[in-house]
Amino acid sequence: MAKTPIDKLNTAVSKILEEYAGDISKNVAEVTKEICKKGAQAVKASARGAVGGTGKYASGWTSEVKTTRYATSGVIYNKSQPGLAHLLENGHAKVGGGRVAGRPHIAPVEEELIKDYEEGVRNAIDTA
C-alpha cells in the first residue's frame, strides 16, 4: 500500500474518485448500448405480432446511443414510419367516425427494459 503525505491526501482521494467515476461511466454506457439494441429487437418482434401487415413498420425499429462528456442516452425509434407508432399503440379516430382500438406493443417492452436497465446500472456500479 502506498503511503501518501497528509498534504497530498486530497489530491490522492480526488484521483481515485475520478477513476471510479470514469469506470462507472464506461460501464453504464455499455449497459445503455446493450439495452437499446435489445429493446429495438424486442419492439420489432412485438410489432410483427401485434400489427401484422407487410413488415415495413416492424422492420423500421432501430436504436441510437449518444455519448457526451457528462451523459450517455439511448433512444429506440421507428425510422421508416415514425408517426405510426403512437397511432397503433394508443388507437385513433376513423375518418367516417368511430375509433380504432390500440394495439399495445411498445409499453410491455418498455416496462421490461426499464427493469433490465436498472439492474444493469446497479451491476455496473458494483463492478466498477
Regions found by a protein language model. Give the residues of each.
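Aromatic/pi-system hotspot detector in well-structured domains
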Residues: 86
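Short, Lys/Arg-rich flexible segments
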Residues: 1-79, 90-128
